[in-house]
Regions:
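C-terminal active-site subregion of NodB/CE4 polysaccharide deacetylases
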Residues: 38, 49-52, 56-133
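Catalytic cores of peptidoglycan-degrading enzymes
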Residues: 46
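Extended, charge-rich helix/loop segments that form flexible
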Residues: 1-39, 43
Length: 133
C-alpha cells in the first residue's frame, strides 16, 4: 500500500486507499473462477497452496505446496490443469527441482516473472514477461 499510495500521490489522486477491505484485497470465489475458466481466452492454473517461495522449502514441503493447490483446482473445476505460476517468479525462487515437480504433476507451462522476450525455442518453464505500466 505504501508504494501504491506514493504512486497515487504523484498522480495527484485524491481518494485515500485503506489497507483493509479494499478492492485490491478481494479474491475471486469459486463461482467466478468457474465462470472465467469456461472462457477460451483464459486458463486457470496453480500458484502454490500458501504462496511460499518454493526454492526456500525442503523437497517435501515444495511438493506439498505444488500438489496441494493442483488437487484443489482439479477437484473444484473437475479438470486437469496444465498451467502454473511460480510465487514471486524471479530466477532465485525456482529451480530445476520445481520444474521437475511441476512436470510430474502434468504441468506443461510455468512463466517466470523475469523480464524479456520469448522465442519458439524458449523453455516453457522459464518463460519471460513483458511488463507494462
Amino acid at each position: 500500500y505504501k508504494i501504491t499510495t506514493n504512486i497515487l500521490k504523484d498522480l495527484k489522486y485524491k481518494k485515500k486507499i485503506s489497507s483493509s477491505n479494499h478492492i485490491l484485497d478481494k479474491k475471486m470465489n469459486w463461482s467466478q473462477i468457474k465462470k472465467i475458466d469456461k472462457k477460451t481466452l483464459f486458463t486457470v492454473g496453480g500458484h502454490t497452496k500458501t504462496h511460499r517461495i518454493l526454492s526456500f522449502l525442503s523437497d517435501n514441503e515444495a511438493k506439498k505446496e505444488i500438489n496441494g493447490i493442483i488437487k484443489i483446482i482439479k477437484k473444484k473445476l473437475n479438470k486437469k490443469i496444465i498451467h502454473y505460476s511460480y510465487p514471486e517468479g524471479l530466477r532465485h525462487t525456482f529451480s530445476n527441482r520445481e520444474i521437475l515437480l511441476l512436470k510430474q504433476e502434468g504441468i506443461e507451462c510455468c512463466p517466470s516473472a523475469e523480464s524479456g522476450v520469448n522465442t519458439k525455442n524458449s523453455n516453457l518453464f522459464k518463460l519471460k514477461r513483458i511488463f507494462c505500466i
